[in-house]
Amino acid sequence: MKLVNIWLLLLVVLLCGKKHLGDRLGKKAFEKAPCPSCSHLTLKVEFSSTVVEYEYIVAFNGYFTAKARNSFISSALKSSEVDNWRIIPRNNPSSDYPSDFEVIQIKEKQKAGLLTLEDHPNIKRVTPQRKVFRSLKFAESDPIVPCNETRWSQKWQSSRPLKRASLSLGSGFWHATGRHSSRRLLRAIPRQVAQTLQADVLWQMGYTGANVRVAVFDTGLSEKHPHFKNVKERTNWTNERTLDDGLGHGTFVAGVIASMRECQGFAPDAELHIFRVFTNNQVSYTSWFLDAFNYAILKKIDVLNLSIGGPDFMDHPFVDKVWELTANNVIMVSAIGNDGPLYGTLNNPADQMDVIGVGGIDFEDNIARFSSRGMTTWELPGGYGRVKPDIVTYGAGVRGSGVKGGCRALSGTSVASPVVAGAVTLLVSTVQKRELVNPASVKQALIASARRLPGVNMFEQGHGKLDLLRAYQILSSYKPQASLSPSYIDLTECPYMWPYCSQPIYYGGMPTIVNVTILNGMGVTGRIVDKPEWRPYLPQNGDNIEVAFSYSSVLWPWSGYLAISISVTKKAASWEGIAQGHIMITVASPAETELKNGAEHTSTVKLPIKVKIIPTPPRSKRVLWDQYHNLRYPPGYFPRDNLRMKNDPLDWNGDHVHTNFRDMYQHLRSMGYFVEVLGAPFTCFDATQYGTLLMVDSEEEYFPEEIAKLRRDVDNGLSLVVFSDWYNTSVMRKVKFYDENTRQWWMPDTGGANVPALNELLSVWNMGFSDGLYEGEFALANHDMYYASGCSIARFPEDGVVITQTFKDQGLEVLKQETAVVDNVPILGLYQIPAEGGGRIVLYGDSNCLDDSHRQKDCFWLLDALLQYTSYGVTPPSLSHSGNRQRPPSGAGLAPPERMEGNHLHRYSKVLEAHLGDPKPRPLPACPHLSWAKPQPLNETAPSNLWKHQKLLSIDLDKVVLPNFRSNRPQVRPLSPGESGAWDIPGGIMPGRYNQEVGQTIPVFAFLGAMVALAFFVVQISKAKSRPKRRRPRAKRPQLAQQAHPARTPSV
């Protein structure tokens, strides 16, 4: 009987302990297991950067020894009579190698020494040194669930306040997936991300990341961490004398990539190169990154994970060095940012063409709320942004290594980035011909294999969700070639092709610009042969559209752009229908072995185009958005429009109708308006085509020719709607940045809007805004409204309509911390030009109610009412009968706001030029002129389905078969190119792919069932042996055995 009890006890222990057996390995340092509520943490990552006073990065045209660099700088500064300068020593592993930059400290006020340095023939550029701050804070995903465990209770503090400033991965994860209903499901089932993406299939084939060098740029790693067996090198690039990770973020990232136990990474046998680039106080410098990047090139790193980023895509030393890294065959993977769900919030370097930018999803395949959205804003105002992120993967509730062992779960795109980096490392180890692996070929494989998520547009998901096995199939038979991203243009496909699909095109409209990225897997450099060719399909009315091209003269590194402008021909002005055609481009790259005959590799790519054309809408329904006069960070300090939002000090989202004014655009489209974007001066549009010019949050100055033309346009029937923002020089001085460490001031270049410039534009109609700054809630026409840091109307014609409200004086609050209420603040004015056929003008003092960035209450209804007024001359009854109508202010006795003395707007303005004294306008630039491509018509039928799952041209998936291996997992069947399977269905299941959770659950249930059956068998036998013998027929004993084993035939 004792033996039976021991057996039962062992079974119970076995059954209860099996689940946690793996999790206990390597946890001897901890006495207590983590409590359940500690298993999922939200990681708040916030960045800020400042310019270090008197310190500059001197970039050279090549790599030189320290002695040569010193000689160049000394000779350059001799003639400038600057004596107070020195080269700042950099003690790190790259000090013994030649470098392409130097950090100097030069104290001068006139900048003569800097100008002299830039004139030296061996010096490429001189830029300020930047100090980067990162703040990490780990918080519970669900604050309702208590946690008594002390292991993860530490709150990480930065040397600076927790806020997002100039360089940022986001505003933190206050809006992370922990607030989603689906997020709570993840608590019960901790996910192993590597197995979820089926990395174990490749492991069992013998691929584990061996012989692949992967670099982790983060907070370091402890020397004897139990999760890692192949840490090749740890280097420190900070001013602290330690290589260990004092925070845990670097350990987590490394674990997702290469942990070998517990929370397994993707490539446990990869060579880990740990670059410690952040101190325990989360401080770093641009020069630390540059030195570390140079060392990564020297070490021939294959894959580099960079879970940092920020909006400053004009930080030239950093951007240039990233280009150099990828040109040296380093595959860089970077987080796209944590500023979602707002659009136009992509972070650098993930927004670069040569970098794999990664967004985040949860385990239910929903786009994570925190994941930043496209488009890129580099190209504004004259162009249009590119598609980013490239792909998305799991970034919510991902498990990774703890700082001393064990596992924890974190969320963020800084978590999704190492998921892709680990997957790429594993993929690279599967490629037999390593010479075919480069940043372009890997990116081509990832985006061509990605599984598209249903109901999500391309600026949220890029090309779709990472599919590891499909990417393996593509890479295993890859041949060097060029490809396009996106691979087709279908302006009728919603929602994936939003915003293009949201509005048809028509004759007379601004050309629709599609920015396509060219990926060149044939070589680091390339070119487009001849010119792209436009081939319209005549049966599909392709001759009703015309296209123009702008493209990179050189494709470097590994990539370039192809901007396509699409317009409607005059003959289709009254036509409605679908038009199709395609573009052919040929890309050439030099052969790897340069032959005397100059042989090149070439690849020809076809880009299908499909558009919907409608008759030109009436003038009253056409709204023109002024993009040309919107400025943003980078490069200048343009402050936020709502001064209450102290954690977001910069206006950096592009102020475009497809970024932070997306909701307003969607509303206007739903109301039947057609919105076009003007990326050129006012002299470059035909005002007779449009009913209303919409100017919102304008920071730019105006050319004199623009002012004169706009006056003529309004007199001839164009209407003008202006949404302004605050402008007060005293407040601007108050909101400037001061960094205690660097003693550096950041002074705003303008206010929320450039009110002095707007007043010059409006002065011809006796209108203008004041420098008052007001805030408050109010009701207008039975609508609740909020005035967020707006200005008031200072002057308005007497025969106009003016609406007033009672507000708090926010300017007084900011300057003196005093509270005052001001009555009859004029905020809205409506005016009809008295001349026959004249237009109408509307002024409103606040744009925050239209802006998605920090909008509290929208005013879309008001915009509707104002457009009804400007388009049809109908004054809304809700405004004409308002009890808040007052006599228009005359502006008597009020001095108009003046530009702040000493501002640097001319540095970033397209209108002003640098000049001593008052700034002067530049010469008026010529209007953009498009050269339409000569069509080469095709008398053939266009393909019916432009998007099949993206295929690289040289790959025949019929021949791609996963090798056999011993496994209970079903064989993954390759999909043939012509097969109509789930690959062509958004959100479909892979052919031959089974449900991962079910696959992992079946062996557990089988084991439990076997144990229960065994226990039952032992108990029954024990009872039978210990029971007193009774007289009964021997024939019944087999029946007892049959009851115990109904599936067996008992033996007598």
UniProtKB/Swiss-Prot annotation:
Residues 877-887 have a biased composition (Polar residues). It catalyses: Processes precursors containing basic and hydrophobic/aliphatic residues at P4 and P2, respectively, with a relatively relaxed acceptance of amino acids at P1 and P3. The modification Phosphoserine is found at residue 168. The 148 kDa zymogen is processed progressively into two membrane-bound 120 and 106 kDa forms in the endoplasmic reticulum, and late into a secreted 98 kDa form. The propeptide is autocatalytically removed through an intramolecular cleavage after Leu-186. Further cleavage generates 14, 10, and 8 kDa intermediates. Residues 187-999 are lumenal. Its main location: endoplasmic reticulum. The record marks 186-187 as: Cleavage. Residues 877-900, 1026-1052 are annotated as: Disordered. Residues 1-17 form the signal peptide. InterPro entries: MBTP1_N, MBTPS1_3rd, MBTPS1_4th, Peptidase_S8/S53_dom, Peptidase_S8/S53_dom_sf, Peptidase_S8_His-AS, Peptidase_S8_Ser-AS, Peptidase_S8_subtilisin-like. Widely expressed. In adult rat, highly expressed in anterior pituitary, thyroid and adrenal glands and in liver. In 2-day old rat, detected in developing skin, striated muscles, cardiac muscles, bones, teeth and internal organs. Highly expressed in retina, cerebellum, pituitary, submaxillary, thyroid and adrenal glands, molars, thymus, kidney and intestine. Residues 190-472 form the Peptidase S8 domain. Its cofactor is Ca(2+). GO terms for biological process: cholesterol metabolic process; lipid metabolic process; lysosome organization; membrane protein intracellular domain proteolysis; mitotic G2 DNA damage checkpoint signaling; protein maturation; protein processing; proteolysis. It is a single-pass type I membrane protein. Keywords: Autocatalytic cleavage, Calcium, Cholesterol metabolism, Endoplasmic reticulum, Glycoprotein, Golgi apparatus, Hydrolase, Lipid metabolism, Membrane, Phosphoprotein, Protease, Serine protease, Signal, Steroid metabolism, Sterol metabolism, Transmembrane, Transmembrane helix, Zymogen. Gene3D superfamilies: Peptidase S8/S53 domain. It comes from the Eukaryota. PANTHER family: MEMBRANE-BOUND TRANSCRIPTION FACTOR SITE-1 PROTEASE, PEPTIDASE S8. Belongs to the peptidase S8 family. This is Membrane-bound transcription factor site-1 protease.
